[in-house]
Design a protein with these regions (language model features):
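Glycine-rich helix-loop-beta junction characteristic of Rossmann-like nucleotide cofactor-binding loops
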Residues: 56, 113, 265-267
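Acidic, Mg2+-coordinating active-site environments of NTP-dependent enzymes
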Residues: 35-41, 48, 60-69, 84-185, ...
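Residues that form generic nucleotide/phosphate-binding pockets
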Residues: 24-27, 31, 143, 224, ...
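Short clusters of hydrophobic/aromatic residues that line enzyme substrate/ligand-binding pockets
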Residues: 9, 75, 99, 115, ...
Length: 287
């Protein structure tokens, strides 16, 4: 189990040192026992894992931590952090309804709970609401106003000229004066149809950080996008003889749709065979 956990935890894409992990686990264990003694409740596995990660970040003196919530945001274990320098929201979709709610608006309310200070906020819009006041993003924006957080709104309207090659997906980010964006061409090693929106959001976030004094150049950004790969995000395994296996972790209706969009973008007109495994509580996914 310890070996598996060491593999699971990484710093700068490298497996963390076993001695560092052992020290972090020892600190987290003592803290967990103290919590149990004071409250009568032992922290959950995710809470303990989050504590271990935070201790590792502290011991390694990390400059920046990209911290993704485990479930929702407001009540998530990761939300104990109060020193955010940037908030980032991807398009909101229905997921974990039993905990987060049945509507996009309900989920947005819980997710917006990560906004606890005036650090800037980058939001990637869904773009499928006729009335912006009804959109889940409007709930996040209201939270930003409450906390004095400057909002940077990006959407697919800023994306143009998407092209797929054998090895990359390329697209243009259009110039936008209000966001201080210039015309920019990016090449991605990941070829999912949703990756341009992901990259646009990350690009905007990096530009905001660079304006805040973090040394991030356009050259660094472009190189990072060209080299970045994430397993099981429309991961293509080539077997030869025109046969490819696609590995993807889509686990909600929106993710399933984006997976099919990615297939159509990369394999239009090709025969396809689907092998799908779904948990019982995610039986609302339809391919």
């Amino acid at each position: 189990k310890k070996k598996n956990m060491v593999i699971k935890m990484a710093e700068n894409m490298k497996k963390i040192d076993k001695a560092l992990y052992s020290k972090a686990v020892s600190i987290a264990r003592n803290a967990s026992l103290t919590v149990e003694e004071k409250t009568g409740r032992h922290p959950t596995r995710f809470e303990v894992e989050t504590t271990v990660a935070f201790v590792c970040f502290y011991l390694e003196k990390c400059d920046i931590v990209v911290l993704e919530t485990g479930l929702g945001g407001r009540d998530d274990a990761t939300n104990v952090i109060t020193t955010e320098i940037l908030h980032i929201f991807m398009p909101i979709s229905i997921d974990h309804s039993e905990s987060l709610g049945d509507s996009l608006q309900d989920i947005a309310r819980i997710k917006s709970g990560i906004i606890k200070n005036s650090a800037p906020t980058v939001i990637c819009y869904r773009g499928d609401f006729n009335n912006e006041e009804d959109s889940p993003e409007s709930i996040i924006i209201n939270k930003c106003k409450e906390k004095g957080s400057k909002v940077y709104k990006v959407s697919r309207e800023l994306i143009d000229n998407i092209k797929v090659t054998d090895s990359h997906l390329e697209f243009d980010i259009l110039k936008n004066k209000s966001l201080s964006l210039d015309n920019t061409h990016l090449r991605l090693s990941m070829k999912g149809a949703y990756q341009p929106a992901n990259a646009l959001t990350a690009y905007m976030a990096l530009k905001v950080l660079s304006e805040s004094g973090f040394p991030v150049s356009d050259e660094n950004i472009k190189t990072a996008f060209e080299k970045t790969k994430v397993a099981f995000r429309f991961e293509i395994v080539e077997l030869g003889d025109s046969v490819d296996i696609i590995l993807d972790g889509a686990h909600n209706p929106d993710g399933a749709k984006k997976f099919v969009d990615s297939l159509n973008l990369n394999y239009e007109g090709r025969d396809k065979i689907y092998i799908t495994g779904i948990f019982k509580d995610n039986n609302n996914i339809i391919f």
